[in-house]
Amino acid sequence: MEHIARFFFGVSGNVIALFLFLSPVVTFWRIIKKRSTEDFSGVPYNMTLLNCLLSAWYGLPFVSPNNILVTTINGTGSVIEAIYVVIFLIFAERKARLKMMGLLGLVTSIFTMVVLVSLLALHGQGRKLFCGLAATIFSICMYASPLSIMRLVIKTKSVEFMPFLLSLSVFLCGTSWFIYGLLGRDPFIAIPNGCGSFLGLMQLILYAIYRNHKGATPAAAAGKGDAADEVEDAKKAAAAVEMADAKTNKVVADDADADADGKSADDKVASQV
């Protein structure tokens, strides 16, 4: 019975994870149509690619027996993420392309090192421990990536940038693999996905709290969420503070300008008469 339950949660995790892997398709279709990556960051796709590669390697029978479902979904995810990275490299500007190539080189180096060490220097339980630790570290990093979005939701009191279905999928995916890991008594699967389940739950709670809030304006939210340009963010924040401090003076100045415009118009009419 336990074996059947574990298989069920593994298959469920495969289906939900596939949805998560395919969720950026709209973004990349936009990149292809505009032939530009605009302000999108390619870092998450490189990190997800590394996580998928390490997890797929960990699930192989000679590394971790009875975890083939881990390999199937992460192998599929590796292909999907690799396609995203290639598209990004094609349409990115030179500076972003060089950064992506550097990250891709780092991803390839880390994965190659893990594979070679596990094959040539380790065996049995030692191999499983080494590969499991590597996969766990990067899985937790991947699940922690939405923390910046959660911070943005709290600051703006708006869930505009945190879609409900995506948050629900993160929660369900993490929960499915967490239970799968528990049933298989595998901490390298249970721990990172337990973290993912918890963070997904936190996103759902934030959604329940702020779903009816108007929140900040889209322009203000975009300004606060632009992590790629810290200098510009600082300027916007300073301008917002200055506007708040000088609100009364601004109203008076506007009224004075309106009076001046009205007087100028009257003088112009009088001169014409």
Curated annotation (Swiss-Prot):
It holds the Pfam family MtN3_slv. The chain crosses the membrane at residues 7-27, 43-63, 72-92, 102-122, 129-149, 164-184, 189-209. Residues 1-6, 64-71, 123-128, 185-188 are extracellular. It is a multi-pass membrane protein. Residues 7-95, 131-214 form the MtN3/slv domain. GO terms for molecular function: sugar transmembrane transporter activity. Belongs to the SWEET sugar transporter family. This is Bidirectional sugar transporter SWEET1a. It comes from Oryza sativa subsp. japonica. The gene is SWEET1A.
